[in-house]
Amino acid sequence: MIKVKVEKDKITITGHANYADYGSDIVCAAVSATVMTSIVGISIIDNEVIDIKQEKDKLDIIINKHVDSTDKLIENMLNCLNEIANQYPKNVKIINREE
């Protein structure tokens, strides 16, 4: 299962969807495409807004500052991930710990 832990200044994505075999997993592809598209968009607007830390099976998005335009991209990413989680509840879980 992919877990997306949402905090005020950090989003952590861990795990595997396990919907299908490696290379054929549409849930993993959807989550990856959503997150990477958002990261690229945010970096184009202001490359100091976020830092990315990637390890095996884990991606941390650290939010260094809040800017309206990039906050909207982050909100859109989370909305898309919520939609994926709603469609595939056995494969994606959103854990909201925003304060």
What are these regions (language model features)?
Residues M1-I26, V35-M36, V40-E99:
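N-terminal intrinsically disordered, cationic/polar leader segments
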Residues V31-A33:
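Gly/Ser/Thr-rich active-site loops/lids in small-molecule metabolic enzymes
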